[in-house]
């Protein structure tokens, strides 16, 4: 639904409609979405939806798989007799993790509206901070945004930096520099950051070979403020001059 590296939000209702026309089961990864607001599961055009608690303030190691009633049968194991979780799986529940996830769900504010081609997120301080960042860098030729600005997760920023010679700066240098200055950012998705291979997503959006290891990902939260964005922008300029 929301791409983790470049923040792109997919037209899930349109995709879901096409899948239904072709009698295709549609599983949707909503991991990046739920922290930005609640939405109507009943109206969402998919068969399965997976969510991860740590993405909306809950504990790691617990998640949710929502299934539409008509689609649930496909998950049932026909060869083994299971008695728990609607005959889908066995296992002892991690009650502390479930309780933590439940409390985090109660803290999610705002409502997401879903249309055929767009997902409309509630206007809040996080979205305003993201727009403020993009506004401040729009004339800086040393910052190259990756992904769409308009069809993007409201808490997501991704870019690569070019030095004074307009050469891409390796992401690990920026991540380490920011870490030394008490700012936590990422150089890629958790799924692929340890593989050492360039991201297929970045390849597919047309980044050059020397840019594939330079993408930076920043996730904003409710505790962030404008002065922190300003400080981050100052450190970005130091990186441009330094590396």
Which residue ranges define each predicted feature?
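Pyridoxal 5′-phosphate
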Residues: 1-243
